[in-house]
Each structure stands twice: as C-alpha cells, then as structure tokens.
C-alpha cells in the first residue's frame, strides 16, 4: 500500500458487514484486511466500524480484534448502535406492539417455524430445534427458551428472525406482504433459511447514517461494503457503496466499487481504492 501521510480521512466513515465481507467464507479475517484497516484508522485517522445482524455478544470478538474502539458499531441489522468503549447501547429501535402481533400471526400460520427474538442483551428462542440451538451454540451466546411468543412480549424486541426450509421461508415472505400493518415493520432477507423483521424504517442504512450524524460526518464521506441482501439498504443509504466479488447481481447493480471476493481481502480492496481516489 502506498504511503500517503499527507492524506487525512478523519472526516470519513467506512462501514463493513462481517460474514462474507470482512471475513472469508470460512469466517477467518484475512491478514490483508487487518493491515488495511490499521492503516486507514491509525495512519490516516479514518473512522471504520462494523454493521452486522449479530447481537452485541456475538459481534464483540470481531470488533475487538480491530483498532476501531473509538467508533460505535451497528448491531442487529440496524436495530441498535453499540459503543464498545463505553459498553453502552447508545441507540435502540424496538419493534412496536403491532409488529409483535404480526410475528404472532406468522407463527400461527406457519407453526413449524423456529423464531429468534433479539433484545438489547439477550436472545429469546421459540420452537428451537435446529437453527436456533446451532446459532447460539456456535458462539455460546446468552439465550432463553420461551414456550410461546406471548412469553416474550414483555421484552423490547430489536429484531425477529424466522427460521425454516427455503420453500417455507418463501411462503413466509409472501404471507407477510399480504398482512395489514405490514408497513409498521421492515423486512429483510439474510439467508435462504431466514427472514427478518425489524421496526419500521430500521435497517443497517438508517443506523449508519445516524452514526455518521453523531460523528459529524457528511453524507459525501460515508462508505460501506457488503455482500448480501441484508446489506442492500445500507449500500443504498451511503455515498460510496461497494460490493464483494461474490455478491449477487442485485448488490453489484447498486455498487460504485466492485471489490474482489471476500476470501481475497475485499475490505482491503475498498480501503485502498478510497485512499487512492479521495
């Protein structure tokens, strides 16, 4: 990487998805990405952070291996902004009571679905047989099993994840769009076996722009990189969107920069481009 000590990126915010973007498909961090982030933050003064569907406990280990403690992170696909330096949720947008009723209707219509409800500091599991236990078990995440959605009602819900086979998830998507009050929440696809629900006007993009406002960063200096449909809103929201090489066509169609495959260091590609171009 060329040395450009005369450049100052302290008025820039660059945000990256984690799985399939910052990390490889094997969920390892390419040394090239780490080196590029260290250079962008420590040498050039830029703001870099992560935006993920993960909760705080799951994202923490990925956050702390990077030199980015001064910049809060986006958690729960935009439902929260967490300041790891203060260890404090500085913004949390909870799903409304109408949204909870929508989740109830979905589970009544598709009783075979597994449901994960993410609160600020816990994961609530309903009908957890395969997907839920695997998810919380992989990172040993704090969680609680609930016998029904009603048992989870007293909590503030950041996001709801419906788990099921791909053909069932497709039916869930179609059903939710037909419901009255569907405009009171925001839906997104995060994989072929998951469909997520958040509060209205809540996604990675809204939280990234809110974070930029907190940091006093102008729109023209906001950038983000992602690889899948749950990154779509974030990429549409920032000035400079980038797609990893393996991203679907729909993601590449809205990107201004096209990085290499995540296995080869897509984040480094993007940061090098920013340093060279701006």
For the regions a protein language model found, what residue spans apply to each?
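Non-catalytic pre-domain segments flanking phosphatase-related domains
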Residues: 1-16, 35, 39
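Active-site phosphate-binding/coordination module
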Residues: 31-132
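Short active-site oxyanion
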Residues: 44-49, 69-71, 159, 220-221, ...
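Short, structured coil segments at secondary-structure junctions
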Residues: 68-69, 77, 181-183, 237-238, ...
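Conserved ATPase-coupling elements of RecA-like P-loop NTPase cores
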Residues: 25-29
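Conserved acidic, metal-coordinating active-site core of Asp-based
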Residues: 112-225, 232-237, 246
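Mg2+-dependent phosphoryl-transfer enzymes with acidic/Ser/Thr/Gly-rich catalytic loops
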Residues: 4-13, 30, 196-278
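Active-site metal-binding loops of divalent metal-dependent hydrolases
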Residues: 18, 54, 226-228
């Amino acid at each position: 990487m060329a040395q450009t000590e005369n450049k100052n990126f302290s008025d820039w915010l660059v945000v990256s998805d984690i799985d399939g973007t910052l990390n490889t498909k094997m969920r390892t961090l390419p040394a090239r990405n780490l080196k590029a982030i260290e250079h962008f933050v420590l040498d050039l003064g830029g703001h870099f952070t992560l935006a993920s569907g993960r909760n705080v406990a799951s994202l923490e280990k990925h956050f702390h291996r990077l030199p980015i403690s001064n910049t809060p992170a986006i958690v729960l696909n935009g439902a929260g902004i967490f300041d790891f330096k203060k260890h404090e949720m500085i913004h949390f947008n909870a799903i409304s009571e109408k949204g909870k009723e929508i989740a109830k209707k979905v589970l009544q219509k598709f009783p075979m679905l597994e449901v994960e409800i993410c609160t600020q500091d816990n994961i609530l599991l309903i009908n957890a047989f395969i997907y839920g236990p695997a998810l919380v078990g992989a990172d040993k995440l704090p969680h609680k099993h609930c016998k029904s959605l009603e048992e989870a009602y007293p909590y503030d819900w950041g996001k709801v994840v419906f788990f099921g086979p791909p053909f069932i998830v497709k039916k869930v998507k179609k059903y939710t769009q037909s419901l009255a009050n569907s405009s009171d929440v925001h839906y997104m696809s995060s994989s072929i076996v998951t469909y997520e629900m958040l509060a209205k006007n809540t996604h990675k993009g809204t939280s990234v722009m809110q974070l930029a406002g907190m940091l006093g960063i102008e729109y023209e200096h906001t950038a983000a990189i992602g690889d899948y449909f749950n990154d779509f809103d974030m990429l549409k929201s920032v000035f400079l969107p980038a797609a990893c090489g393996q991203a679907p066509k729909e993601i590449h169609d809205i990107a201004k920069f096209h990085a290499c495959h995540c296995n080869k260091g897509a984040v480094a590609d993007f940061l090098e481009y920013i340093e060279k171009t701006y």
